[in-house]
């Protein structure tokens, strides 16, 4: 696996693992199959896993797999703020706290804005205090 360093010098695999579409049965992620996929990627050198609040159980699944296999401190997790669900600062804080709970961690490595495509949306988030919250 090839790696690039982030701005803090942390090596990040050039291939990340997107966690949007795990196979499901009866609306639930097929745990054993998806866990094998995550572990195979990790064994191949992948250390960057991308999930999101709206990815249908993905955060909970990833948190469980990393906890069960002792991987949390060995990987980097990116998840996303669903800005379209945010109405105020309390919504930002509540959503982030829920993501931490789902991921079974007290931090995420990279927190992204999900589908932020225009200046108007960014201005709305700024009016809720997102810049101060990020700092």
Residue ranges and their predicted role:
Residues 61-64, 80, 91-98:
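Generic beta-strand or strand-like secondary-structure segments
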Residues 39, 87-135:
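Glycine/proline-rich, positively charged
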Residues 73-85, 111-116:
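A short, structured active-site edge motif that brings together acidic residues
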Residues 20-33, 80-91, 119-123:
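Active-site mouth loops of central-metabolism enzymes
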Residues 69-70, 78, 127-128:
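Short alpha-helix boundary/capping motifs
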Residues 50, 80, 106-109:
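Acidic active-site catalytic centers that drive phospho-/nucleotidyl reactions
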Residues 1-75:
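N-terminal binding-site loop/beta-alpha segment at the start of enzyme catalytic domains
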């Amino acid at each position: 696996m090839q790696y690039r360093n982030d701005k803090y010098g942390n090596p990040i695999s050039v291939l990340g693992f997107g966690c949007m579409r795990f196979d499901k049965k009866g609306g639930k992620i097929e745990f054993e199959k998806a866990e094998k996929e995550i572990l195979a990627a990790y064994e191949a050198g992948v250390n960057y896993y991308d999930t999101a609040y709206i990815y249908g159980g993905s955060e909970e699944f990833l948190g469980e797999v990393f906890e069960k296999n002792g991987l949390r401190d060995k990987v980097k997790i990116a998840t996303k703020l669903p800005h379209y669900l945010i109405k105020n600062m309390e919504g930002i804080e509540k959503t982030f706290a829920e993501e931490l709970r789902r991921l079974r961690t007290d931090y995420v490595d990279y927190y992204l804005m999900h589908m932020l495509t225009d200046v108007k949306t960014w201005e709305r988030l700024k009016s809720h205090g997102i810049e101060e919250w990020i700092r």
